[in-house]
Amino acid sequence: MMSISLIWGIAVVVSCCIWFIIGIRRRKVGEPPLDNGLIPYLGCALKFGSNPLEFLRAKQRKHGHVFTCKLMGKYVHFITNSLSYHKVLCHGKYFDWKKFHYTTSAKAFGHRSIDPSDGNTTENINKTFNKTLQGDALCSLSEAMMQNLQSVMRPPGLPKSKSAVWVTEGMYAFCYRVMFEAGYLTLFGKDISKTDSQRAFIQNNLDSFKQFDQVFPALVAGVPIHLFKTAHKARERLAESLKHKNLYMRDQVSELIRLRMFLNDTLSTFDDMEKAKTHLVILWASQANTIPATFWSLFQMIRSPEAMKAASEEVNGALQSAGQELSSGGNAIYLDQEQLNNLPVLDSIIKEALRLSSASLNIRTAKEDFTLHLEDGSYNIRKDDIIALYPQLMHLDPEIYPDPLTFKYDRYLDESGKAKTTFYRNGNKLKYFYMPFGSGATICPGRLFAVQEIKQFLILMLSYFELELVESHTKCPPLDQSRAGLGILPPLNDIEFKYKLKH
């Protein structure tokens, strides 16, 4: 009579054989090279997740510029030749770029699908974003952000005795605190009936946001939030504060949120909590990448004496041209849209900081079987497969960016000091050379506001404060690879700096 262990052993072997026979995808003629990985369902996910850049470089050396990997039950076709990016986007009629994003949003934030085709709402969310994050609406949003940044950085009633004192703080913690509060107030307004407790309210939301955001990569990967009790409670607290009954009590709510409240109330079947969670999506999208992007921009600027000098001269010149004067009385600074757009040095600093820290994954799902025509050849793609671009491969390509791991503040400036828009690879001009915000239909709708608020932050830091790193020769902190694929990677550890108000 067979032992229990032998029976289990046979069962495992049989299961593995069945999986090998029917569970492994076979490469067909005309398809890209295929790597199923060794682990059922996960495929190559663990290796990819540990270091996506090195994983893709290794696969590129083995298979060429186009290859397929099984990741979490999905088959992902990676296109790694930056000269082919524009060709991918030309196949837009075969792609469903919404499916992945809508599914991920519902999974991470806990609301029903916001895809109009699923019947829960008829709101076109992209149309809403385009209407409220461009043109005159962007001007109003930027003006509010500038006011809130100054209020947070230089709170009214600050004793003069404290103005000349050096304050030492973690730079990432500082950027997190300032950008979260100013951004929250800009989008969701202020409760003027609770002025004294406003800061405590923001701090509580900041703490909850950190707890929720910490597990966000796991949620995107499909891990149920109920396994993270602290993060689950934090998400529910954040959503509770964004219920319409609470937002109606706040003043100076942005046009974006006011319009979304109206459309949620008139076009959706969401309950109060689900409506609030769709606003939580916007809170997360406005903070999760902007905060680390702000840190990297400030850190790289302070760390480079040449960048600090060039940026300070540009900001001082812009303020003088605008008739703005800094004084010990703390006069507010205001630069309009045209003036903010005419700061090529700051633009280049921000772009270079994001080039070195962005690790987004541009994803599109195939709506049907089709043939993808690229510079490297033609490939057959199956329905429901995923096409993916990983721009970090391009951002760190030495053929495009010489000495790619070195911060060069003027990398995006031409010889005349204006924005440089021409880059080459193998002698061929690139149509896409900088993609921290995505591309095509999936490009981030809030990218213009994000860049402007980082620029405003840098302007105010240079205008109001003397800035120094505690250790002048501080090394650049490593990137937190656990968030690879989600956008801008935060530092793995904080960096101490010190600041004091200028006189």
UniProtKB/Swiss-Prot annotation:
It is found in: Endoplasmic reticulum membrane; Microsome membrane. Heme binds at C444. GO terms for biological process: bile acid and bile salt transport; bile acid biosynthetic process; cellular response to cholesterol; cellular response to glucose stimulus; cholesterol catabolic process; cholesterol homeostasis; negative regulation of collagen biosynthetic process; negative regulation of fatty acid biosynthetic process. Its cofactor is heme. Its EC number is 1.14.14.26, 1.14.14.23. InterPro entries: Cholesterol_7a_monooxygenase, CYP450_sterol_14alpha_dmase, Cyt_P450, Cyt_P450_CS, Cyt_P450_CYP7A1-type, Cyt_P450_E_grp-IV, Cyt_P450_sf. It catalyses: cholesterol + reduced [NADPH--hemoprotein reductase] + O2 = 7alpha-hydroxycholesterol + oxidized [NADPH--hemoprotein reductase] + H2O + H(+); 4beta-hydroxycholesterol + reduced [NADPH--hemoprotein reductase] + O2 = 4beta,7alpha-dihydroxycholesterol + oxidized [NADPH--hemoprotein reductase] + H2O + H(+); lathosterol + reduced [NADPH--hemoprotein reductase] + O2 = 7alpha,8alpha-epoxy-5alpha-cholestan-3beta-ol + oxidized [NADPH--hemoprotein reductase] + H2O + H(+); lathosterol + reduced [NADPH--hemoprotein reductase] + O2 = 5alpha-cholestan-7-oxo-3beta-ol + oxidized [NADPH--hemoprotein reductase] + H2O + H(+). Pathway: Lipid metabolism; bile acid biosynthesis; Steroid metabolism; cholesterol degradation. The chain crosses the membrane at residues 4-24. The keyword Cell membrane does not apply. One of its GO terms (cellular component) is intracellular membrane-bounded organelle. Signal peptide: none annotated. It comes from the Eukaryota. Induction: Up-regulated by fasting, returns to ground state upon feeding. Up-regulated by experimentally induced diabetes. Down-regulated by insulin treatment. It is a single-pass membrane protein. Keywords: Cholesterol metabolism, Endoplasmic reticulum, Heme, Iron, Lipid metabolism, Membrane, Metal-binding, Microsome, Monooxygenase, Oxidoreductase, Steroid metabolism, Sterol metabolism, Transmembrane, Transmembrane helix. Its main location: endoplasmic reticulum. GO terms for molecular function: 24S-hydroxycholesterol 7-alpha-hydroxylase activity; cholesterol 7-alpha-monooxygenase activity; heme binding; iron ion binding. A cytochrome P450 monooxygenase involved in the metabolism of endogenous cholesterol and its oxygenated derivatives (oxysterols). Mechanistically, uses molecular oxygen inserting one oxygen atom into a substrate, and reducing the second into a water molecule, with two electrons provided by NADPH via cytochrome P450 reductase (CPR; NADPH-ferrihemoprotein reductase). Functions as a critical regulatory enzyme of bile acid biosynthesis and cholesterol homeostasis. Belongs to the cytochrome P450 family. This is Cytochrome P450 7A1.
